[in-house]
UniProtKB/Swiss-Prot annotation:
Family of the protein in this entry: Belongs to the GCKR-like family. MurNAc-6-P etherase subfamily.
GO molecular function: carbohydrate derivative binding; carbon-oxygen lyase activity; ether hydrolase activity
EC supergroup of this enzyme: lyase
Keywords: Carbohydrate metabolism, Lyase
Full protein name: N-acetylmuramic acid 6-phosphate etherase
Length: 294
């Protein structure tokens, strides 16, 4: 029942929200937001377990699939679409599904989140299999669309995890691993796009970033698999080579072009003073880890 969910409770500190000054509203929001990172911190051990499972999926050429409705679904898609430019992944490696389809990203689709079968259809459409990991996201922890997706994922042998913002969430029963970040009452009663949404975003940031580090997408703290899809990212790529190797910008730019805009290869070429082909071979043997290639 909704009334039993902490995310649906009224916040005792904001009973007079409509009477507050603009500054008081903003201060109140900021005060509540400061509690979110602390709530996430309590779940780090559970998040770590999820990351390990995702890394295993990636190592087996499986995928990470997020499913959610409303804000939760949008956050999953947001995290997924940032992976290709940041980590050089293809657009199938991390995917996000929202109840009602992509049109629901910008406009609510009535009733979609209440239909378990829609998630099964979405996951069937990509040929979900036992190598994949499905993460169901629901602030309330009870969304039927997410439950349906987790049930189907389990039926095909995929790994499953859930992210919710209430303890003892319903969706936790349908996932092997559970992250339950208890964010409590919102300043605007039931508006889980606020603290709950922020908590979900923080957890998704952790999962995707730590998982990509785990499969060699990062050297030191540099995103060496960045895709140079625009002028800003071309410049960033060259700067990454400078930071990783200590050479001048000109030398970095030269090796960037010699390496056919492959930042990892350019770094290996500079540090080992080798040719492009040899750098690629070393990276292949090292399974993409720059540090191991060196």
């Amino acid at each position: 029942m909704l009334e039993n969910l902490s995310t649906e409770h009224r916040n005792e500190k904001t009973m007079n929200l409509d009477e507050m000054s603009i500054k008081e509203v903003l201060q109140s929001m900021n005060e509540e937001d400061r509690t979110v990172a602390l709530a996430v911190e309590k779940e780090i051990e559970h998040i770590e377990k999820v990351v390990r499972v995702v890394i295993q999926s990636f190592e087996e050429e499986g995928r990470l699939i997020y499913i959610g409705a409303g804000t939760s679904g949008r956050l999953g898609i947001l995290d997924a679409v940032e992976c290709p430019p940041t980590f050089g992944t293809d657009d199938k490696m991390v995917q996000g599904f929202i109840a009602g389809g992509l049109k629901a990203f910008t406009k609510a689709v009535e009733g979609a989140e209440d239909r378990e079968e829609l998630a099964e259809e979405d996951l069937k459409s990509i040929g979900l299999n036992e190598k994949d990991t499905v993460i169901g996201i629901a602030a309330s922890g009870r969304t039927p669309y997410v439950i349906g997706g987790l049930k189907y994922a389990h039926s095909v042998g995929a790994s499953t995890a859930s992210i919710s913002c209430n303890k003892n969430a319903e969706i936790s029963k349908y996932a092997k691993l559970n992250v339950e970040v208890e964010t409590g009452a919102e300043i605007l009663t039931g508006s889980t796009r606020l603290k709950a949404g922020t908590a979900q975003k923080l957890v998704l940031n952790m999962i995707s970033t730590a998982s990509m580090i785990g499969v060699g997408k990062v050297y030191k703290n540099l995103m060496v698999d960045v895709q140079s899809t625009n002028e800003k990212l071309v410049e960033r790529s060259k700067r990454i080579i400078v930071e990783a190797t200590g050479v001048s910008y000109e030398v970095a730019a030269e090796h960037y072009e010699k390496a056919e805009r492959n930042v990892k290869a350019a770094i290996v070429m500079v540090l080992l003073q080798c040719e492009y082909g040899e750098a690629l071979e070393k990276l292949k043997v090292a399974k993409g880890f720059v540090k191991k290639a060196l």
